[in-house]
From Swiss-Prot:
Name under which the protein is recorded: GPI mannosyltransferase 1
Gene that encodes it: gim-1
Gene Ontology CC terms: endoplasmic reticulum membrane; glycosylphosphatidylinositol-mannosyltransferase I complex
Its biological purpose: Mannosyltransferase involved in glycosylphosphatidylinositol-anchor biosynthesis. Transfers the first alpha-1,4-mannose to GlcN-acyl-PI during GPI precursor assembly. Required for cell wall integrity.
Top EC class of this enzyme: transferase
Length: 487
């Protein structure tokens, strides 16, 4: 009888070996991400100096102008269209510094350019910190138990036979560090993320704040989580949508590490919590109250300080402006055309005929219902990171103003969802989703290019239909995310 020798193992391909080296240790990945941003920063300087189409984002010029006003002891809101917290202008004060007279002309020019680019370097560095936090959360696992919970596990096991306590809540298995870095690379090596930050968009700072907030919540550092939540909402309004999900997630069983009642919500549980008072008492736990107090105190303290310094312009430009905002430029939203028509009617000649009902004033209702009520109640207790992703995705998709910078709000959360997602288990589905998402933007950008650079009126039907197409694609992706999180 003939015997067959075992098949020789296939040699690793060069590409798989390269990826293995990249993710096996942190240094190669983070150095690669760092070099990517350095290359883009240098290229941006060249393009700004040699091309009529500038690399630097117009928002960065607004930031640095506001910082210049602050350096002269004036309000950052003296710069028209500055709609951000003064803290951002304070952070960018080094962009106003210049070289001294002791430097020669060439050296002074280099130093001045370097100082002016300080904000871009800061935002790019924030990308790297956000990527590191993504890795930490993935290694931690989505239900990382607190030290108190670990201590209670022994007590739970001892009293388990009495039936008074159920099984302990164990942590979901954290990811292997090398695999976690592979998913963090989706953010760190993403050319879209790196380009937006090196052009001078501050969204990378939000990425750090959001990931730090999630890390603090999952590791049960409630006071720190409250401070980060309050600061994040002050810095940029949208993180307030995370508060309902975090509060709903923070039940006694999850924070203590022990599930009440062996049946996990059987008839006895319902009887003990039947009254409204008992239900309210169970909901208003000390950790929830601590989170609410620290986040609200942080938010109000910062706003009080800024109001004392800069008065009503701070409230108007940082918060109130966004309720009635009608910015239609570079806007992927289906509301784009309506906002354009509304902006055209805001003139003295049209003021008498201007309708009292404005769709842009009510456009926030669908996004708030989805992102602060329906999605948190559905997903938060099952998978908090996926809930935050779905909430952010819904908020951006249904927002009346949707720009490329806003995509970073949910891209930073994407690596936390992908490992268990349908888009990852079915590579074909993932590629289709990515292709449609990119194609939707490309079609819109083609129509916008004809409008802005060729002077052709493409609002109807081209630009509007492209916006609707991109909206439909995003709604489908959102449906898949919610379905995955609800499993």
């Amino acid at each position: 009888m003939a015997t067959t020798s075992p098949a020789a193992p296939r040699p690793k391909s060069k590409s798989s070996s390269l990826l293995s080296t990249l993710f096996s240790r942190p240094l190669p990945l983070y150095v690669s991400a760092f070099l990517l941003r350095i290359v883009l920063l240098l290229y941006g300087l060249w393009q700004d100096a040699n091309s009529p189409l500038k690399y630097t984002d117009i928002d960065y010029l607004v930031f640095t102008d506001a910082a210049r006003f602050v350096s002269r002891g004036e309000s950052p809101y003296a710069r028209e269209t500055y709609r951000y917290t003064p803290i951002l202008a304070w952070l960018l004060l080094p962009t106003t510094w210049t070289a001294g007279a002791q430097w020669g002309p060439w050296a002074a020019k280099v130093i001045n350019v370097a100082w002016f680019s300080f904000g871009k370097v800061l935002f790019a560095a924030a990308d790297l910190v956000a990527g590191w936090l993504i890795e930490q959360v993935l290694v931690m696992g989505k239900d990382f138990p607190s030290s108190a919970a670990k201590g209670k596990e022994k007590d739970t096991e001892k009293t388990k036979e009495g039936g008074k306590k159920g099984p302990s809540v164990t942590a979901s298995t954290g990811m292997d560090p090398s695999r976690a870095r592979a998913f963090a690379a989706i953010w760190l090596l993403n050319p879209m993320v790196a380009t937006i930050s090196t052009r001078g968009s501050s969204e990378g700072l939000l990425g750090v704040l959001v990931m730090a907030l999630l890390w603090a919540v999952l590791s049960r550092r409630i006071t720190l989580a409250g401070l980060l939540l309050g600061f994040s909402v002050h810095f940029k309004i949208y993180p307030f949508i995370y508060a309902p999900a975090i509060v709903w997630w923070m039940d006694q069983e999850r924070l203590s590490g022990v599930r009440a009642g062996g049946g996990g919500g059987g008839g006895g549980q319902k009887k003990t919590s039947s009254s409204f008072r008992k239900t309210l008492t169970r909901f208003l736990t000390l950790p929830r109250l601590l989170l609410a107090f620290t986040s609200l105190a942080t938010f109000l303290s910062l706003n009080f300080l800024m109001y004392r310094l800069y008065g009503h312009p701070f409230l108007q430009e940082t918060y109130l402006h966004h309720v009635t905002r009608i910015d239609h430029r570079h806007n992927f939203s289906p509301y784009n055309t309506q906002l354009y028509l509304s902006s055209a009617s805001v003139s003295p000649s049209h003021s008498a005929a201007e309708p009292k009902f404005k769709i842009e004033s009510l456009a926030f209702l669908p996004q708030l219902v989805l992102s602060t009520i329906l999605i948190p109640l559905t997903l938060a207790k099952k998978d908090l990171p996926t809930s935050l992703l779905a909430q952010t995705f819904a908020f951006v998709t249904f927002n009346k103003v949707c720009t490329s910078q806003y995509f970073l709000w949910y891209l930073v959360l994407l690596p936390l969802y992908l490992p268990r997602s349908s888009f990852w288990t079915s590579k074909r589905m993932g590629l289709v989703a990515l292709g449609l998402w990119v194609l939707g933007q490309a079609l819109w950008l083609q129509q916008a290019y004809e409008l802005e650079f060729l002077g052709r009126s493409t609002f109807l039907p081209g630009l509007w239909m492209a916006s609707l197409g991109f909206f439909v694609v995003n709604c489908w992706i959102l449906g898949v995310i919610v379905g995955d999180g609800g499993r």
